[in-house]
């Protein structure tokens, strides 16, 4: 089993548990160049989204694949979710370790007002 398959198995297991709860989830995906975040409701509809690929976020950053960029995405996704009336979410790290950019995004979203 390779690294990607292991990550996807962890992600599937976590998503099933979150699905049973029937709550909104904050989904994080990262690539070497960008960080993406979406708030998805219980009916699998995207409520809010933010990423370093967006011009609004990336133009204030020097580099889009680091911890500072993830913090900017976390703050932006929290603001957009709160605008739509979502304040409580479950954190779906998509099988990535809770470390570095994933942890930075989560911390920034919490500081901006999301609860999880």
From Swiss-Prot:
The keyword Flavoprotein does not apply. One of its GO terms (cellular component) is cytosolic large ribosomal subunit. GO terms for molecular function: 5S rRNA binding; structural constituent of ribosome. Gene3D superfamilies: 3.30.420.100. Keywords: Ribonucleoprotein, Ribosomal protein, RNA-binding, rRNA-binding. CDD domains: Ribosomal_L18_L5e. Coiled coil: none annotated. It comes from the Bacteria. InterPro entries: Ribosomal_uL18_bac-type, Ribosomal_uL18_bac/euk. It holds the Pfam family Ribosomal_L18p. GO terms for biological process: translation. This is one of the proteins that bind and probably mediate the attachment of the 5S RNA into the large ribosomal subunit, where it forms part of the central protuberance. Part of the 50S ribosomal subunit; part of the 5S rRNA/L5/L18/L25 subcomplex. Contacts the 5S and 23S rRNAs. Belongs to the universal ribosomal protein uL18 family. This is Large ribosomal subunit protein uL18. It comes from Shewanella loihica (strain ATCC BAA-1088 / PV-4). The lineage of its organism: Bacteria, Pseudomonadati, Pseudomonadota, Gammaproteobacteria, Alteromonadales.
